Every structure is written in C-alpha cells, then in structure tokens.
Swiss-Prot record:
Enzyme Commission number: 3.4.16.5
Subcellular location: Vacuole
GO MF annotation list: serine-type carboxypeptidase activity
The UniProt record lists the keyword Hydrolase: yes
Protein name in the entry: Carboxypeptidase Y homolog A
Species annotation: Neurospora crassa (strain ATCC 24698 / 74-OR23-1A / CBS 708.71 / DSM 1257 / FGSC 987)
Propeptide feature: residues: 18-137
Primary localization class, coarse: other
Catalytic activity: Release of a C-terminal amino acid with broad specificity
Function field: Vacuolar carboxypeptidase involved in degradation of small peptides. Digests preferentially peptides containing an aliphatic or hydrophobic residue in P1' position, as well as methionine, leucine or phenylalanine in P1 position of ester substrate.
GO biological process, one term: proteolysis
Disulphide linkage map: C191-C431, C325-C339, C349-C372, C356-C365, C394-C401
PROSITE patterns: CARBOXYPEPT_SER_SER (PS00131)
C-alpha cells in the first residue's frame, strides 16, 4: 500500500515536521492544489461542476460523523480547488507501435465454440472479450540481460475505452512445460508491478549504477511469472481515461489472462496462481472472484497469495496502535500520549468504516479513509520512521523510502530498455499518485473486499502471509482479519496451532504458519512490507512449498 507524500488526506503528513495535523494539512494543500487540484475533485461525475459546500448539502443521508468530517475537510481545502472540473489522472502521452509478433483479437476468441460433455455447444471461454486485443512481443533476452529464459511483453488493449495494460512474462528457469504460472501484482493503488520484478522477486535487480544484477532466489526459479502494470496509467500502462476502483480493474485482468493463455496454450494447462502484496489485498479477491465466476475459462486458477495486504480495514486499522506502540514484536515508535490518542480515535474510525461497509457509498467511505489514515498513519509518518519497515528510518523521501526505486525508474526510462520491451509511453514512474488519490476519492480504500474470500475458499486455497516488521499493512492486522473472517471453516482455522516455518535441514525457523481447510496464515520474521526483498531465500521456500500444495486441503 503506497501513501502519497504530497497529500495529507491520505494520512501522509510530512515526516520532517511535527506540527499539528491541521497546520500540516493547510500547508500541504495550499502548495499542491494549485498544480494538482484534479486530485481532489468531487468523487461523483454528477457533482463534477459543484463545490464542496454544495455537494455536501446534497447528501443528507450521510451519518452525523461523516457530515462532521466533510465539514472539517472543507475548512482545509483552498476555495479555488474546485474552480473547474478536471480529470483525476492525466492521460499519458503514447505512440502506438506496429512491430508486434502476435496480435490476439478478443472478438475472434469470442467466436470459438466447443461441444461439451452433454453434447451441447457453448463458447470456449466466457466473458465479454469483443473489445479486447492482446499484443505480444518476443523479448530478446540478450538485449537486456534480465534473464536468459523465454520472455514476452506487450499490451492488453481495451479499444472501446482506450485502455492499454502492460505486462512482462518470464518463463520458468526450471521446467516451463510443467511448472505453474504466477501472476504478480503490486499495490498502491497506482504502483507498478515492475517494482516487484526488480526490487523483490524477479530474475534480476538494478544497482546504483543501473546495472542488472541476477537474483538467485527469483520466483521464476520454479514457476513462470507474469508482471502486470495495472490499473491503467500505472508504470508502462496508459489510457485516455481512468480506472478508479478495484472492480473495474478485474474485468481487464480476466481479459488479459484469457487472451494470453489462448495465444500460449502451452502455459494454459499448468496450474495458475495469483500473488501480490499491499493494495493487492483489495485486487486479488476481486480478480479471483471474476475468474471463478466464469464456468467456461482457460485459466486454471489453483490458489491466491496475499502478502501484507489491506483486505478488511475494519479489523486491520485496530492494529495500527499496537504495532506502533511496541506490541508487535518491535520497540515502540510512538510516545505514550500518541498511543493514547490513537486509542481515543479508534471508536470514531471504526464507526466510520462500519458505515462505509453498510452503505458502500463514496460519501461514507471517503470520510472513513481520510479520518482513519490521518489518525493512525499520520502520527507514525511524522516520526520519519519507515512505514514499510518499523526497524529503520525512511532513507529516501522522494522514492517511498527506498533509493532503489529511483534506480529502477532510471533504468526503465532508458530508451533501449523501452524499445526492447515495445513500450509505447514516453516514460516510466514507479507510482502514480493521481491513481492513488483517485481510488481514495471513489471510496475504494475502505471497501470490505474480505467478504469475497469465503466464496473463494469454497473453490481454491488462500494464503495470507505477512512480514512482521511492516507497519502499513502489519502482521497483527492480517492475522486478526484472517481469524475474524466468517466462513464455514472459521472454528477449525482459529483452533489450528501455529507451527514453525524453516528451511529444509535448517535448525532456525524463519516464521510461523497455521492452516486449516483451504485457509493459511504465515508470519515471516524480520521482513517488512516487501517480504521477498527482505527474506529472499525464505520467501522462495514458502512459495515453492505452497505451489507444491503442502498446505492445501486434501
């Protein structure tokens, strides 16, 4: 989960200042709304020409706490912030290329019919694919040196809505004819999955001199991996329009996978898994549910993995205070008075989230996100401590605490790299904070996507893993929501004992695991938000064991 350093509305008060929330908010908003007032335009299109004052009055159905919070927000927003309507996320400049090795037309795939076991004809794959095309480029491994394996890159095109999602596929280093396929998703919302590729689990990393450094613990050691930049306008992806909620992005991902496996049936017969971290705790339940909803599909989905995710905010936000105040296994970051303030803020935060859960309205969900993020994330950020790793300070404010993100961006902005991958945009950025704010102001942040998990558990196994040094999506909250989830196997899961996780023939454990039915939770020691980066060997171990079915219900 990425928090914009430029907007206090996301809880990102300046780490360099200990001033009060209101003073910081006024300063940040005054500086930023002149150049990016589109980031906080009214969330509903029908109110695009109104001011905060007028659209507030239109929603008498809001509860008193939500109304009060909108009043507070209005005091912080400059009067000219809504002078004219603008798009949330600015379209990226892009130039279409013609040098593709394959173009798969969704309309052609949609026309394919097969005869079922009952003798009746039905479409080979379900879903609406007519408007989608998939473009594929064979990447020459020798040009970039990221890996020696077979690679493909390209775009999924939604021609009707002018959306173009970039992907990069790496074949397994081991046995690609039989090894599973994994889709990897980073979060944000609005952050490129190429971060996961080069910072965490891909075949190579990028050093300070922009050199490619091989990763011996890459997740494609025993699986083929697809890295996807989504939603649109993230990383190398682009559009003239915007995606502002998780559900809309799910249709795109289903189309991409369907067309990819149609073009490459040699990978379609293998087991397929979706893995991701952070805001992918929102994405993955929706994407998996979308795939499973299609009876006729060529996607052999076998499990999902969510690492340090945001999935059930009502339960998870309760655990920011314990994690920041010394109850998560690491020393306290906040003072006793700050911890008491967080305790005092919890009832209001939970009331706002419950109202969001019940109504689903942006007018309830936006205040919940704004209030709770400022009360529970803001105080921590003001200390200068890394929100993604409680063990140290933020080393680079301009690159989400990690200088390596800047190196990755510089590498991916090189012309020879973009040409080798068939990139159509003018440049790359690791995170698009317009998208981040867009999702916030569409009410997506606090939505109860955990409610989809019981339905997924009926079909396939689910793994929740969490590095225990992360603050932003900490292990306490992830363990708590997995135990609070209402599903038929709840009692058995909660009674299951935590067992040691360790490498084969190793005496030292690297975490704990509990599993029952199709549900598994892991706590990974000495790892922050990005577990594969901090514990590369251990993360590859539990990945391979998970893909091998060690904790699957028999």
């Amino acid at each position: 989960m990425r928090i914009s350093a430029s907007t206090v509305l996301l809880g990102a008060a300046s780490a360099a200042s200990a001033a009060s929330f209101q003073n910081q908010a006024q300063h940040v908003l005054a500086d930023n709304f002149h150049k990016a007032h589109d980031a906080v335009k009214p969330v509903a299109d029908s109110f695009a020409h109104t001011t905060l004052e007028s659209f507030e009055e239109a929603f008498n159905g809001m509860n008193s706490q939500a109304k009060a919070l909108w009043d507070e927000i209005k005091l912080l927003v400059p009067e000219n912030a809504f002078d004219k309507p603008t798009w949330f996320s600015k379209p990226k400049a892009a130039k279409r290329r013609k040098d593709w090795d394959h173009v798969v037309k969704g309309a052609d795939v949609q026309k394919l019919w097969v005869k079922g076991a009952d003798g009746e004809k039905h479409r080979e794959v379900g879903g609406q694919l007519d408007n989608f095309n998939l473009r594929v480029k064979s990447v020459d491994p020798s040009k970039l040196g990221v890996d020696k394996v077979k690679q493909y890159s390209g775009y999924l095109d939604d021609e009707e809505n002018d959306k173009h999602l970039f992907y990069w596929f790496f074949e397994s280093r081991n046995d690609p004819k039989n090894d599973p396929v994994v889709l990897w998703l980073n979060g944000g919302p609005g952050c490129s999955s190429l971060t996961g590729l080069f910072l965490e689990l891909g075949p190579s990393s990028i050093d300070k001199k922009l050199r490619v450094v091989s990763n011996e613990y890459a997740w494609n050691n025993n699986a083929s991996v697809i890295f996807l930049d989504q939603p649109v306008n993230v990383g190398y992806s682009y559009s003239g329009n915007a995606v502002s909620n998780t559900v809309a992005a799910g249709k795109d991902v289903y189309a991409l996978l369907t067309l990819f496996f149609h073009q490459f049936p040699e990978y379609a017969k293998q087991d397929f898994h979706i893995a991701g971290e952070s805001y992918a705790g929102h994405y993955i339940p929706v994407f998996a549910s979308e795939i499973l909803s299609h009876k006729d599909r060529n996607i052999n989905l076998k499990s999902v993995l969510i690492g340090n995710g945001l999935t059930d905010p009502l339960t998870q936000y309760e655990h920011y205070r314990p994690m920041a105040c010394g109850e998560g296994g690491y020393p306290a970051v906040l003072s006793e008075s700050e911890c008491r303030s967080m305790d005092n803020a919890l009832p209001r935060c939970q009331s706002l989230i419950r109202n969001c859960y019940e109504s689903g309205s942006v007018w309830s969900c936006v205040p919940a996100a704004i209030y709770c993020n400022n009360q529970f994330i803001g105080p921590y950020q003001r200390t200068g401590q890394n929100v993604y790793d409680i063990r140290g300070k933020c080393e680079d404010d301009s690159n989400l605490c990690y200088s390596a993100l800047g190196w990755i961006s510089d590498y991916l902005n090189q012309k020879d790299v973009m040409d080798a991958l068939g990139v159509e945009v003018e440049g790359y950025e690791s995170c698009n904070f317009d998208i981040n704010r867009n999702f916030l102001f569409q009410g997506d942040w606090m939505q109860p996507f955990h409610r989809l998990v019981p339905g997924i558990l009926k079909e396939i196994p689910v793994l929740i893993y969490a590095g225990d040094a992360d603050f932003i999506c900490n292990w306490l909250g992830n363990k708590a929501w997995s135990e609070a989830l209402e599903w038929p196997g709840k009692n058995g899961f909660n009674k299951a004992e935590l067992e040691d996780l360790s490498l084969p023939k190793a005496d030292k454990e690297y975490g704990k695991v509990k599993s029952s039915g199709n549900f598994t939770f892991m706590q990974i020691y000495q790892a922050g938000h990005m577990v594969p980066m901090d514990q590369p060997e251990n993360s590859l171990d539990f990945l391979n064991r998970w893909l091998g079915g060690e904790w699957f219900e028999q």
